[in-house]
Amino acid sequence: MNYPNGKPYRKNSAIDGGKKTAAFSNIEYGGRGMSLEKDIEHSNTFYLKSDIAVIHKKPTPVQIVNVNYPKRSKAVINEAYFRTPSTTDYNGVYQGYYIDFEAKETKNKTSFPLNNIHDHQVEHMKNAYQQKGIVFLMIRFKTLDEVYLLPYSKFEVFWKRYKDNIKKSITVDEIRKNGYHIPYQYQPRLDYLKAVDKLILDESEDRV
């Protein structure tokens, strides 16, 4: 299976990282060594098993190019490509609220670049927000080992600035000022719904 640029898909073994004891120590002492996606996956599993929320990662659409049929009852996919997602990474339901968000990581220490956010994703977030959904970006600064929830209502200001060719990124200070910090902890790894609770409270006042 290949990405749109033709490069083959390979599982990132660094996500699980080495021995099981090392992986367990990551759970106790923070997010170092694990991807944001894996952290969110752990949290979503905890929320589901605890009857707190039902939030899932949307599957990446795949375009099948070449299929072989060695037997009538068996099909073998020889070539396929990951297509660009048309919406955001995650959605679900929490206490009657529709939750929709995109998750991104950056190695930059001072800013989050906007060039890996797509127009159709922002359009989807806008539509979900207009229907009173709880919409946001979850951004991790890998080097700083900090994670923030940035509400769509704040993000759209920075996106407009980006589309107007004024600034191509959001500084970490702007995210700290306009977002909600999500600290690492033991269980769940990223209890981002605490930040969502604050967002719901703030937006309930703003949308009145």
Swiss-Prot record:
Classification via CDD domains: RecU-like
Cofactor binding annotation: Binds 1 Mg(2+) ion per subunit.
Record's catalysed reaction(s): Endonucleolytic cleavage at a junction such as a reciprocal single-stranded crossover between two homologous DNA duplexes (Holliday junction)
Biological process, per Gene Ontology: chromosome segregation; DNA recombination; DNA repair
Annotated site (Transition state stabilizer): K104
GO cellular component annotations of the record: cytoplasm
Location (main, coarse): cytoplasm
Keyword Ribosomal protein (UniProt): no
MF-aspect GO terms: endonuclease activity; magnesium ion binding; nucleic acid binding
Location within or outside the cell: Cytoplasm
Cofactor(s) needed for function: Mg(2+)
Residues annotated as binding Mg(2+): T87, D89, E102, Q121
InterPro entries reported for this sequence: Resolv_RecU (IPR004612), Restrct_endonuc-II-like (IPR011335), tRNA_endonuc-like_dom_sf (IPR011856)
Source superkingdom: Bacteria
EC number in record: 3.1.21.10
Top EC category: hydrolase
Keyword terms: Cytoplasm, DNA damage, DNA recombination, DNA repair, Endonuclease, Hydrolase, Magnesium, Metal-binding, Nuclease
Function: Endonuclease that resolves Holliday junction intermediates in genetic recombination. Cleaves mobile four-strand junctions by introducing symmetrical nicks in paired strands. Promotes annealing of linear ssDNA with homologous dsDNA. Required for DNA repair, homologous recombination and chromosome segregation.
NCBIfam families: PRK02234.1-2, PRK02234.1-4, PRK02234.1-5, recU
Family membership: Belongs to the RecU family.
Descriptive protein name: Holliday junction resolvase RecU
Lineage: Bacteria, Bacillati, Bacillota, Bacilli, Bacillales
Gene transcribed to yield this protein: recU
